């Protein structure tokens, strides 16, 4: 039997444990790093990185989502009108619809005579369009800046990781008795999620892998309806 988990990231976040406005401490660290790397402006499109800064999950699908950061403080967020934001994200939001050229609108706010950082997830169709519009004197990979800042945890993040790890240990203790109750892998998976919710987690960071038998030896096993052959001695 195997229950796959990672104690430092399994419990996504705690109820009321994460804000929904731009984290100024993280933003300051990013802007300082941008200055050090001579990248005065940058486009962040990765929903995970945007959540890291704003505490808000936005999944745009194929549509443009771009957080524009500038060391001069002229920050903008490009969001399609299909994803209206009810809460304050701490940044000016510019909405566009499907009949508008979102990149062209974005290009009106950038500094075209300066280097532009682009993160590693921004689709090429948007990058090429920005290049056509002359949206920067040159384009560089800006992801190492944010990736490094995310790696170095601040005190609040370290505290959350400790709490998450402690909750995870408790969850593992609670799920073990259920292994011998004849549940399918999917049913055990659902029970695992239920336990995390009872312990105060809003959600899991990734889908738990619950596996019996040979599936337990598969590092990427897909949880199914099989049952384990478990005997209590």
Where would I find each of the regions flagged by the language model?
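Short catalytic-site patches enriched in acidic/histidine residues
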Residues: 50-60, 145-146, 183-233
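Flexible, acidic/His-enriched mid-domain "rim/lid" segments that flank
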Residues: 24-28, 101-204, 215
């Amino acid at each position: 039997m195997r229950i796959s988990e990672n104690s430092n990231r399994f419990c996504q976040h705690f109820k009321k444990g994460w804000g929904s406005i731009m984290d100024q401490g993280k933003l300051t660290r990013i802007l300082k790093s941008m200055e050090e790397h001579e990248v005065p402006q940058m486009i962040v499109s990765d929903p995970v990185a945007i959540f890291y800064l704003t505490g808000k999950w936005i999944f745009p699908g194929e549509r443009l989502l771009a957080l524009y950061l500038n060391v001069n403080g002229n920050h903008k967020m490009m969001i399609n009108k299909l994803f209206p934001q009810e809460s304050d994200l701490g940044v000016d939001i510019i909405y566009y619809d499907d009949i508008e050229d979102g990149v062209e609108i974005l290009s009106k706010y950038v500094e075209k005579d300066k280097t532009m950082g682009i993160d590693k997830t921004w689709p090429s169709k948007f990058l090429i369009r920005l290049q056509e519009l002359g949206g920067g004197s040159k384009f560089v990979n800006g992801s190492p800046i944010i990736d490094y800042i995310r790696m170095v945890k601040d005190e609040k993040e370290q505290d959350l990781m400790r709490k998450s790890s402690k909750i995870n240990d408790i969850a593992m203790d609670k799920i073990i008795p259920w292994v011998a109750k004849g549940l399918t892998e999917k049913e055990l998976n659902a029970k695992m999620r239920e336990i995390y919710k009872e312990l105060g987690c809003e959600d899991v960071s990734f889908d738990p892998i619950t596996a019996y038998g040979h599936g337990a030896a598969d590092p990427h096993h897909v949880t199914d309806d099989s049952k384990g052959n478990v005997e209590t001695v």
